[in-house]
Regions:
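Local sequence-structure signature of Cys/Sec-based thiol-disulfide redox active-site neighborhoods
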Residues: 8-32, 36-41
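Thiol/selenol-based redox catalytic cores and closely related redox-interacting motifs
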Residues: 41-121
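Short, Lys/Arg-enriched N-terminal segments with co-localized hydrophobic residues
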Residues: 1-8
Length: 121
């Protein structure tokens, strides 16, 4: 999809079908006629490269953590691991990641962020 200035939007939405915010993100892009690729995190998840790029884009792995995730044991474990192990543990346990993750090339957001997406257009 091309916009003013010739910028191309290549939107990927990472989330699950049960996530209310993921559904809202899909609706936001559909209403604006912006094509996107939906990746179900329960089926596929993020590759390590995608995970690392999202971490860089949002200011670190800690921005991705869903503090209200159901897996309280792994959530607690994250706090006690060495810093070098924390990102690896989060990557291995993607059910702890806030949804949706929306990527546009090197840009990314965590959660429902229509104000940020508006700036991409």
């Amino acid at each position: 999809m091309y916009f003013a200035g010739g910028m191309t939007m290549n939107i990927q939405i990472f989330g699950t079908s049960k996530s209310f915010d993921t559904k809202k993100a899909q609706r936001w892009f559909k209403e604006r006629g912006i094509k996107f690729q939906m990746i179900d995190m329960k089926e596929k998840g993020m590759s390590r490269g995608e995970f690392d790029n999202v971490c860089r884009a949002v200011g670190g792995w800690a921005q991705l953590v869903d503090e209200s995730a159901k897996d309280k044991d792994t959530l607690a474990l994250l706090q006690w691991l060495d810093e070098s192990q924390q990102a690896d543990k989060l990557f291995e346990n993607q059910q702890l990641i806030r949804q949706p993750i929306v990527r546009n090339g090197r840009l990314a957001t965590v959660g429902y962020c229509p104000d940020a997406w508006e700036k991409w257009a």
